[in-house]
């Protein structure tokens, strides 16, 4: 599929027809009628438009019955960087050494023992479970400012990770990836180009190559119902270490 995108004559409808044909014979490619909400808990739906991302995140939280003012254990997050003054370079390096770099996939485990701290599972890290000062931002449709249920004065910043833009997904990979095709169709209809290539082709290439083993090409604006409540049972649970800012920093 990625190779096919190099054909200058290939249109969006032709590409979708190829996906549909391949899906009939190859279980690694799925022509999907809806976004699978269970998958979003550990592998974000990939979208082009920011509005789609925010809408899917809020739909995800809604079907799981997540309260507006707090996170449920098991909700996915994406690290959006470290918000620390330059003088605290060592603390920044400590956080980054534990895997909290921009774009890192994280699962929320619960509130930490100290105000502003969250217990987190950093996906792929050697010691994945930590407690860190956190600034967690939940964006909502038609609201300019995100809601911040957990905010330390400084620390690691996070966005919700149930959906992410394809641009932000560059450099990341997941076993199974869901691509929200209506967004790519919109990009194709607009006729936009990027670096001399149709934008939809660049988006499609990045999106499908994020998948390590399975691709779901979602063609309808629908969301499945969860098969179970959000939980953290799939994560290896250990006592998280405190990755704290120095005590004087918090005063």
Locate the predicted segments by residue.
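C-terminal accessory regions
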Residues: 118-250
């Amino acid at each position: 599929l990625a190779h096919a995108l190099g054909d200058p004559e290939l249109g969006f409808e032709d590409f979708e027809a190829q996906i549909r044909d391949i899906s009939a014979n190859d279980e690694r490619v799925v022509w999907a009628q809806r976004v699978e909400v269970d998958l979003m808990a550990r592998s974000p739906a990939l979208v082009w438009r920011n509005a789609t991302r925010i809408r899917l995140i809020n739909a995800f939280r809604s079907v799981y019955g997540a309260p507006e003012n707090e996170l449920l254990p098991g909700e996915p997050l994406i690290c959006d960087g470290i918000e620390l003054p330059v003088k605290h370079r060592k603390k920044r390096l400590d956080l980054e050494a534990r895997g909290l770099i921009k774009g890192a996939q994280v699962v929320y485990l619960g509130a930490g023992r100290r105000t502003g701290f969250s217990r987190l599972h950093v996906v792929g890290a050697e010691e994945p479970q930590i407690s860190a000062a956190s600034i967690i931002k939940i964006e909502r449709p038609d609201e300019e400012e995100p809601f911040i249920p957990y905010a330390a004065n400084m620390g690691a910043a996070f966005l919700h990770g149930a959906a992410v833009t394809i641009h932000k997904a560059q450099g990341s990979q997941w076993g199974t990836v869901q691509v929200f095709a209506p967004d790519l169709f919109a990009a194709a209809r607009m006729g936009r180009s990027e670096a001399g290539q149709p934008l939809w082709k660049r988006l499609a290439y990045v999106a499908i190559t994020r998948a390590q083993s399975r691709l779901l090409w979602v063609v309808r604006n629908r969301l499945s119902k969860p098969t179970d409540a959000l939980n953290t049972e799939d994560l290896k649970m250990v006592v998280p270490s405190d990755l704290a800012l120095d005590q004087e920093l918090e005063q």
